[in-house]
Amino acid sequence: MLRKLANQSLSVAGKWQQQQLRRLNIHEYQGAELMSKYGINVPKGVAVASLDEVKKAIQDVFPNQSEVVVKSQVLAGGRGLGTFKNGFQGGVHIVKADQAEDIASKMLGQILVTKQTGAQGKVVSKVYLCEKMSLVNEMYFSIILDRATAGPLIIACRKGGTSIEDLAEKFPDMIIKVPIDVFKGISDADAAKVVDGLAPKVADRNDSIEQVKKLYKLFCETDCTMLEINPLAETSDNKLVAADAKLNFDDNAAYRQKEIFSLRDSSQEDPREVAAAKADLNYIGLDGEIGCMVNGAGLAMATMDIIKLHGGTPANFLDVGGNATEGQVVEAFKILTADEKVKAILVNIFGGIMKCDVIASGIVNAAKQVQLKVPVIVRLEGTNVEQGKRILKESGMKLITAEDLDDAAEKAVKALA
């Protein structure tokens, strides 16, 4: 939704961009610690992984607090309205300090299901204990990379505390968008435009401008792709506070952001996506039944569209790229066959840099290592296509061949029957 609000184009003319495999997403407590290092106001809090740690934190960190906020830590939104598989309702609770241990016991080690986790949910390994702040106003603030303006874009709204989708629908006139010149950086005028648009009720204007500038500094210096604060709150002591934040980082910057990338929690990520990343494959899991292996992101998207056109649903986006090795093809098949939802696999290769014979050899080797229990539909075209077809034919494998993409998609859908 942020991308739609930014009204960004699909590409930046004349600029080559390395394909981004994944974006690092960190937990709320990690984001709060990072923002605090940049002088950004955040609630006092501590992450704990056991009931003993909860008890100690209440005694040491919140000795004079009558109430605290207990937040389950999963890499997904919608925690407050989520449901644990043990029946406990809500992943965020404001409780009496002496009740924190009991509430945490219902969260730690349990699976939380939200609108963003899917039915499988995510395991809560830590909870974040925060001070309960006295808020007088809630707003929305984010910074994203906007391809339309070829730079960072600040999106803000006077209303906050709910999803940006709802805010944009209910309060379109309150949405503020301020593009920032990536070469000049954020100016006092830029930050003032954001603050004046938000029209804080009690927070000091000059202090608020400095907070916006610090948020922008963090965004740039840590190679963020998205920084979202919802709510950006005003407190009764006239401060602007990042009450809840999400930060994503560009994987291409991992080599120079080693400290941040050491925060990656692979246990919260799709294991198939983790395996794909290790093999330098671009994979995104979906909910369909037809596994896809394609070279090139554009062709992969087109393949998924054609599958939908013929009444099927893709199980994934999987781009093996233009220089895939046999080993990567084998790994791709392992990832596809590990998905129990997959009832058929469609391989769609247009060989340019990628050679069809390499793909064919990879398919044959994969069949030897992985028990293929589902139909495999193969469409090959381009470089070394005849050699590739010969390798498949001589392998003795029971493959379904297709002449073109439309034919391949139609056969994949029929194979489900």
UniProtKB/Swiss-Prot annotation:
GO molecular function of the protein, one example? ATP binding
Query: In which tissues or organs does this protein occur?
Result: Expressed in roots, stems, flowers, leaves and fruits.
What PROSITE patterns does the entry give?
A: ATP_GRASP, SUCCINYL_COA_LIG_3
Pfam families xrefs: ATP-grasp_2, Ligase_CoA
State the free-text cofactor note. Binds 1 Mg(2+) ion per subunit.
Q: Which residues cross the membrane?
A: none
GO CC annotations?
mitochondrion; succinate-CoA ligase complex
Q: In which pathway does it act?
A: Carbohydrate metabolism; tricarboxylic acid cycle; succinate from succinyl-CoA (ligase route): step 1/1
Highest rank taxon of the organism: Eukaryota
> Which positions in this protein are listed as binding Mg(2+)?
230, 244
Q: Which GO terms describe its biological process?
A: succinate metabolic process; succinyl-CoA metabolic process; tricarboxylic acid cycle
- Residue span, ATP-grasp domain: 32-275
Read off the InterPro entries from this record.
ATP-grasp (IPR011761), ATP-grasp_succ-CoA_synth-type (IPR013650), ATP_grasp_subdomain_1 (IPR013815), Succ-CoA_synthase_bsu_CS (IPR017866), SUCC_ACL_C (IPR005811), Succ_CoA_ligase-like_bsu (IPR005809), Succinyl-CoA_synth-like (IPR016102)
Annotated transit peptide: 1-24
PANTHER family documented for this protein:
SUCCINATE--COA LIGASE [GDP-FORMING] SUBUNIT BETA, MITOCHONDRIAL (PTHR11815:SF10), SUCCINYL-COA SYNTHETASE BETA CHAIN (PTHR11815)
HAMAP family (UniProt xref):
Succ_CoA_beta (MF_00558)
Give the multimer and partner information.
Heterodimer of an alpha and a beta subunit.
Entry function: Succinyl-CoA synthetase functions in the citric acid cycle (TCA), coupling the hydrolysis of succinyl-CoA to the synthesis of ATP and thus represents the only step of substrate-level phosphorylation in the TCA. The beta subunit provides nucleotide specificity of the enzyme and binds the substrate succinate, while the binding sites for coenzyme A and phosphate are found in the alpha subunit.
Question: What is this protein called in UniProt?
Answer: Succinate--CoA ligase [ADP-forming] subunit beta, mitochondrial
Organism phylogeny: Eukaryota, Viridiplantae, Streptophyta, Embryophyta, Tracheophyta
